[in-house]
């Protein structure tokens, strides 16, 4: 979900008009802070050093992904259904690493451990700022690196391990 889509000024202007309803955890671990969401969400999370450690040495530029559009739509639907108040915020914690294989997301693997650390940091930082943050869901999009997986049964076993945590 790291995203490689082009980011236009027009798209960023639309995001600015959305106000402070969507925020994201910008930075890694202790250096993180909650800020108004802008693309690219994954500029810190999806860096070259992390991709290289997972066997993807491409230097692809991070761009627009599906996370922010998903959050904007979710906020609109929840608000229209009167399930949230006018000041409710959705917080995104970007952890995607473009080009990573699902095996790096297994419980105990490097990216899984990093994901858990980021979520804990996000909840802690929100709490320190007087916010009552709760993890309510996860948007997991696994794609191209496992598209030609020969052993689909093993892929789905791994996916179930990742998604059941």
Where would I find each of the regions flagged by the language model?
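Cell-envelope and extracellular/periplasmic
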Residues: 1-165
């Amino acid at each position: 979900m790291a995203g490689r889509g082009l980011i236009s000024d027009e798209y960023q202007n639309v995001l600015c008009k959305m106000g402070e309803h969507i925020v994201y955890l910008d930075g890694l671990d202790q250096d993180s802070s909650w800020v108004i969401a802008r693309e690219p969400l994954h500029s810190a999370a999806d860096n070259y050093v992390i991709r290289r450690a997972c066997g993807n040495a491409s230097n692809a530029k991070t761009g627009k992904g599906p996370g922010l559009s998903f959050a904007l739509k979710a906020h609109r639907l929840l608000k229209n259904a009167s399930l949230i108040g006018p000041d409710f915020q959705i917080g995104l914690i970007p952890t995607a690493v473009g080009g990573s294989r699902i095996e790096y997301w297994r419980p105990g693997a490097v990216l899984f451990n990093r994901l858990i650390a980021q979520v804990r940091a996000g909840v802690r930082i929100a709490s320190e700022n007087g916010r009552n943050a709760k993890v309510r869901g996860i948007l997991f999009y696994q794609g191209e690196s496992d598209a030609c997986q020969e052993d689909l049964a093993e892929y789905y076993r791994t996916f179930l391990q990742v998604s059941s945590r």
